[in-house]
């Protein structure tokens, strides 16, 4: 059994399976990525820098083991997936050779047998940050995420502004004061075939792209839960991708974390029920946006949800709370 997860779902999966039996991560872990191959969990990047670790959840002596360092430099918001015994890492946010923050669209492959990395000669047709990745029928699928040109341009402007607070305020106002559709978040579904290292168009959402959604995949169905609709504005939407019969259908389920929604939440499956927990957002931002304020989160404080929601029998129910609000 191969599963695709993000760093966000590792905590949720551990929570559902009784997290007390697993050792703490080797370093405080945030904004990284991870994947499960059979019973072994792999995590890396984010606050771990270029480090990667693995944990055999069935071992008698459960402990994290350090792996070869990632060759592409420290990155946040990369995603990863196991396919045919190899780990693939997609995109992320990091520093380029000039020291500027940018979105990457590259792919790296890790071979557990040789404990080695290789950068593939393959680039997605768009940047990959805030995106989600899942596996279906031997291919990796990617959707969502920020627009590479807009995001990179924002950080180029901030770099040029230096410590000029007036210029920075002007840049932020210009960046955040737009409608959601003007950020061009990715609503395309892309497929990556590891046998050819080629990217292909696989469809697109009939609604809109999100960034920082939680993703859950089981069989022919994948769920995208909440996320950003634009910088600072979340959505409470839940999308379902159904591959049944090799005919991709997009469905919209009942919302959760209403009315403002969250980004960077945790999600997983337990006893055939979909679980969604945590996430961060700005209370009041949705109302501001609906009232015509594009810079919807201006002046609002980011809050972290502790709520645990369960999707069962066609509806969401609050089933408990995390020990504290958390996200990413």
Positions of the model-derived regions?
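Kelch-like beta-propeller repeat domains
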Residues: 18-328
């Amino acid at each position: 059994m191969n599963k695709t997860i993000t760093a966000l779902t590792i905590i949720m999966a551990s929570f559902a399976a009784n997290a007390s039996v697993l050792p703490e991560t080797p370093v405080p872990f945030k904004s990284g990525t991870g994947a499960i191959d059979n019973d072994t969990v792999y995590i890396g990047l984010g606050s771990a820098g270029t480090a990667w670790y693995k944990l055999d959840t069935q071992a008698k002596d459960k402990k994290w083991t350090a792996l070869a360092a990632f060759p592409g430099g420290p990155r946040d918001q990369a995603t990863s997936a196991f396919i045919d015994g190899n780990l693939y890492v997609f995109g992320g946010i990091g520093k380029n050779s000039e020291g500027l923050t940018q979105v990457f669209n590259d792919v790296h492959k890790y071979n557990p047998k040789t404990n080695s990395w290789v950068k593939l000669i393959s680039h997605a047709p768009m940047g990959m940050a805030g995106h989600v990745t899942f596996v279906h029928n031997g291919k990796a699928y990617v959707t969502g995420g920020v627009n590479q040109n807009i995001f990179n341009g924002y950080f180029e402007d901030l770099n040029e502004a230096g410590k000029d607070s007036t210029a920075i305020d002007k840049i932020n106002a210009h960046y955040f004061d737009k409608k959601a559709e003007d950020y061009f978040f990715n609503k395309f579904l892309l497929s990556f075939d590891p046998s050819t290292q080629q990217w292909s168009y696989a469809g697109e959402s009939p609604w809109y792209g999100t960034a920082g959604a939680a993703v859950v995949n089981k069989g022919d169905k994948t769920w995208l839960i909440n996320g950003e609709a634009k910088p600072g504005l979340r959505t409470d939407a839940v999308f379902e991708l159904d591959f049944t019969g090799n005919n991709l259908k997009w469905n919209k389920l009942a919302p959760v974390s209403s009315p403002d929604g969250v980004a960077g939440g945790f999600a997983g499956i337990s006893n055939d029920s979909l679980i969604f927990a945590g996430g961060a957002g700005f209370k009041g931002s949705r109302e501001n946006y609906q009232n015509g304020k594009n810079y919807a989160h201006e002046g609002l404080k980011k809050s972290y949800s502790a709520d645990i929601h369960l999707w069962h029998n066609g509806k969401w129910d609050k089933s408990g709370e995390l020990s504290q609000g958390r996200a990413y």
